[in-house]
Amino acid sequence: MRKVMKPMKDVGIVGYGAYVPMYRIRNEEIGRVWGVSSFPIEEKAVPGLDEDAITIGIEAARNALKRAKIDPQKIRAIWFGTESKPYAVKPSATIIAEAIGATPDLEAADFEFACKAGTEALQAAIGFVGSGMAEYAMAIGADTAQGRPGDHLEFTAGAGGAAFIVGEKSNESVAYFEGSYSYVTDTPDFWRRQHEHYPRHGNRFTGEPAYFHHIINAAKTLMEELGLKPSDFDYAVFHQPNVKFPLTVAKILGIPKEKVLPGLLTGRIGNTYSGATMVGVSAVLDIAKPGDRILWVSFGSGAGSNAFSIVVQDAIEEKRDLAPKVEDYVKRRKVIDYALYAKARRKYIL
């Protein structure tokens, strides 16, 4: 049985865009409040009072449209992956579609699968375009991640997102998909029940049986099915709940950390959950050369991984400067203290 997934038509990325909120809180500041002196990252992005997963998705989608240079009316599906949607009952994707001028002739839906909701939406978009049902489809991954005050998640739960517009592979594609693979099991490593404010996690259980098991199996299977070796890739982007985990995966797979660091942003903006690997791949596309091959592996608790192999095309040279780059957003920062952070994240629950 063939495990790798390939659509009937070759599919490429015609436009991509990212967005990261301006505000930052240093891990040192969080540690000062909770009496902690060792930190997993340097700082994380914090959404403003008027920002949420939808507004982040809109900004990313607009940047993707700038690079795609297409009429938004040609987009026949907008699928939005998040685990922090503002409405419990009401789709977020419809708001994004309206904001970018893509309504009314399209599919729209919200996807959920913890931190791989965005790449789950991307898998669907590839299939939708690859089957011939649509000329273009957009997949978005964005989150304003939450962590219980004082919990170790609070040090890393960031905010940000990215959008990818896919279409049939052509000279207008900045990159194309060689194939993809998904690996899923029922692993309860991280969850949040209805009406609870903050997620719960299985501490160390989130590592070996969850994150590492799924990402490594997804990456190895994809490479085996495509006949590729770790040395065939110029860059690798793995889900990044912290800085340590993706570098450990790279070491296990035999990929030098120099190929991982360009897309490893968690240390500076935090774990953007559904946006994590999508923002990371956007950062890599901002600097990649035509012909470069990128290994892209997401992870979502519950648990599963999506793995993609993409190859950069000539159009990247023209299109990457048509919208703000990831590094532009990372450098655009204003540091705030814990009091303002707690207000912005609505941690004062009355």
From Swiss-Prot:
Binding sites annotated in the UniProt record for CoA: R204, K244
SUPFAM superfamilies the record matches: Thiolase-like (SSF53901)
Signal peptide: none
Keyword Transmembrane among UniProt keywords: no
Pathway: Metabolic intermediate biosynthesis; (R)-mevalonate biosynthesis; (R)-mevalonate from acetyl-CoA: step 2/3
TM region(s), chain numbering: none
Sequence positions that bind (3S)-3-hydroxy-3-methylglutaryl-CoA: C115, T156, T206, H239, N271, S301
One GO MF term: hydroxymethylglutaryl-CoA synthase activity
Protein family according to the UniProt entry: Belongs to the thiolase-like superfamily. Archaeal HMG-CoA synthase family.
Record text on subunit structure and interactions: Interacts with acetoacetyl-CoA thiolase that catalyzes the precedent step in the pathway and with a DUF35 protein. The acetoacetyl-CoA thiolase/HMG-CoA synthase complex channels the intermediate via a fused CoA-binding site, which allows for efficient coupling of the endergonic thiolase reaction with the exergonic HMGCS reaction.
Protein name, UniProt field: Hydroxymethylglutaryl-CoA synthase
Species this protein is from: Pyrococcus furiosus (strain ATCC 43587 / DSM 3638 / JCM 8422 / Vc1)
